[in-house]
Amino acid sequence: MTPTLTRVTEQVDRQTFWRGWLDAHLPAEMAGKLTGVVEREGALVIFAESSAWSARLRYAVQEIEAQIRASGPGITEVSVRVLPRGAKA
């Protein structure tokens, strides 16, 4: 596998891991409003479909941030942003 393909594969694996992890640790209605998640350079960025859901998600993430960091030891920052459905990260 080429280095680029390896990096992309690892990135997809991390997105899949975090999406499943968040689905399991957030309330079902909130997990359904996630539009993406990206782990990059020690930062975990969680995307919500609207600004209203982003605000609610920020509070929920604050409550589980210690668990997030325990599950991803390299995570030094967790943030929530808006990414409407159908938009590209």
Annotate each PLM feature.
Residues 1-28, 32-41, 62, 70-89:
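N-terminal presequence-like segments and adjacent domain-start helices
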Residues 41-61, 87:
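A short interface-forming secondary-structure element
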